[in-house]
């Protein structure tokens, strides 16, 4: 068993959602294997199933001026921000082939980044075992996680703040949590890191944590498989 992995670069949110949905349909039909999409989004705000527009702190006029779109989506969680310098991952995995354990799947997603941050950057990150999903450094979230599961196949996924402009999180109450902050890899290590290097590391740690080999696909190869 292997994981198909494709780095798409910067992709508009709606386009990425279309690609996810296409892969999801093929995964349900067993016509494609487990697939991990890695990408960046232009500035966008998404509202999960438990979310509220009340957690967007700026006006519609401000968002329009800044060319920031807002989408209500089917993932778990509340409000989050995506933008340049943030590595977004969409794992479309069939949980029916394992043990249909959604909590374990989220645990493994968190484990990818906990191990990566410790091994590669010497930073201690942790889960909030009692309350919230995601990966934290102290009281600050560095990886947000929100998934959806339909017919035991996952969609949506994680957002890893690499070189993200953290000021943009002031536009929202991140994940609806007023008493928590956000951080980035850049802030933790005190320097900007080459984004593609982080992509490579995340791919590697996905393989390690999920115990599978990787099938690295170019964008054209993926689109050929999807017939788009």
Curated annotation (Swiss-Prot):
Superkingdom in the source lineage:
Bacteria
Q: Where does substrate bind?
A: 75-82, 144-146, 157-159
Q: Which NCBIfam families match?
A: lipB, PRK14345.1
Please state every residue range assigned to the domain named BPL/LPL catalytic.
Answer: 30-214
The listed locations are:
Cytoplasm
Does the keyword field hold Cytoplasm? yes
Stated name of the protein: Octanoyltransferase
User: Any idea which UniProt keywords this protein has?
Assistant: Acyltransferase, Cytoplasm, Transferase
Question: Which residues carry out catalysis?
Answer: 175
Q: Which family does it belong to?
A: Belongs to the LipB family.
Listed under GO cellular component are: cytoplasm
Q: Which organism is it from?
A: Caldicellulosiruptor bescii (strain ATCC BAA-1888 / DSM 6725 / KCTC 15123 / Z-1320) (Anaerocellum thermophilum)
